[in-house]
Curated annotation (Swiss-Prot):
Alphabetized Pfam families for the sequence: DapH_N, Hexapep, Hexapep_2
Catalytic activity: (S)-2,3,4,5-tetrahydrodipicolinate + acetyl-CoA + H2O = L-2-acetamido-6-oxoheptanedioate + CoA
Family note: Belongs to the transferase hexapeptide repeat family. DapH subfamily.
This protein's encoding gene: dapH
Organism from which the protein derives: Leuconostoc citreum (strain KM20)
EC number: 2.3.1.89
An individual GO BP term: lysine biosynthetic process via diaminopimelate
Pathway: Amino-acid biosynthesis; L-lysine biosynthesis via DAP pathway; LL-2,6-diaminopimelate from (S)-tetrahydrodipicolinate (acetylase route): step 1/3
Keywords associated with the record: Acyltransferase, Amino-acid biosynthesis, Diaminopimelate biosynthesis, Lysine biosynthesis, Repeat, Transferase
Function: Catalyzes the transfer of an acetyl group from acetyl-CoA to tetrahydrodipicolinate.
HAMAP family the record matches: DapH
GO molecular function, one term: tetrahydrodipicolinate N-acetyltransferase activity
Protein name: 2,3,4,5-tetrahydropyridine-2,6-dicarboxylate N-acetyltransferase
Disulfide bonds: none
Length: 234
């Protein structure tokens, strides 16, 4: 079970991290001053590109005409970098936003537009569909499916609070919301649009607002909600 110490480590990481405003600057002209070691430079003396923190790059380009500078920037005083996805043994589609300190299991699938916050855990073979949101410390087991637009509420603070925990072989339908601290048991199905405010027993189907048990999993339900292994191959 996730402990308060785990949460406290994340809180400490965010609080103590150096806040950066990452930029990519294309410039034409002569820079002012020496380029810090923490800034990457590509190109020549009077034309090139700088990559680094705005606080270090801004003085270098301050004397250049505005028309000779193009700045690309998508964050301000950011405390948590994005995950380095190159070594992840999973399929991650363009447009997914995944913060650092996220764990992704083998053969998982992260679709376009998914947002996954710090401390989240995704089991092997699990699919996070388009536009789904996994809040801080949310946990999803193996071979599960989180539907498009679904939200697993995050809980970084208070540190003592329990995160959302989704079991193995669970299907969470499109646009469903699972509230902080709720646990969904193995093999359960959460219907599309449901708002889950209480724990869901294993092998049950819940639906509605708030979500209530409507039946036990049967063979017909299993056929309708079966996952396709071919979609998880690399």
């Amino acid at each position: 079970m996730t402990t308060a110490n785990d949460a406290q480590q994340l809180i400490s990481f965010i609080a103590n991290a150096k806040k950066v405003t990452p930029v990519k600057v294309t410039y034409k002209g002569v820079l002012t001053g020496e380029i810090p070691a923490t800034v990457q430079q590509f190109g020549g003396v009077s034309f090139g590109q700088l990559i680094g923190d705005w606080s270090e790059i801004q003085p270098l380009i301050a004397a250049l005409p505005a028309e000779n500078v193009f700045v690309e920037n998508d964050a301000r005083n950011s405390a948590v970098p994005l995950l380095d996805k190159k070594a992840v043994n999973a399929r991650i589609e363009p447009g997914a936003i995944i913060r650092d300190q996220v764990t992704i299991g083998d053969n998982a699938v992260i679709m376009l537009g998914a947002v996954i916050n710090i401390g989240a855990e995704i089991g092997s073979g699990t699919m996070i569909d388009m536009g789904a949101v996994l809040g801080g410390r949310a946990i999803v087991g193996e071979q599960s499916h989180i539907g498009a637009g679904a939200v697993l509420a995050g809980v970084i603070e208070p540190a003592s609070a329990q995160p959302v925990r989704i079991g193995d072989h669970v299907l969470v339908g499109a646009n469903a919301v699972v509230i902080e601290g709720v646990q969904v048991g193995d093999g359960a199905v959460v219907a599309a649009g449901a708002i889950v405010t209480k724990d869901v027993p294993a092998n049950t189907v819940v639906a509605g607002v708030p979500a209530k048990i409507i039946k036990q999993i049967d063979s017909k339900t299993q056929q309708k909600t079966a996952l396709i292994d071919a979609l998880r191959g690399l």
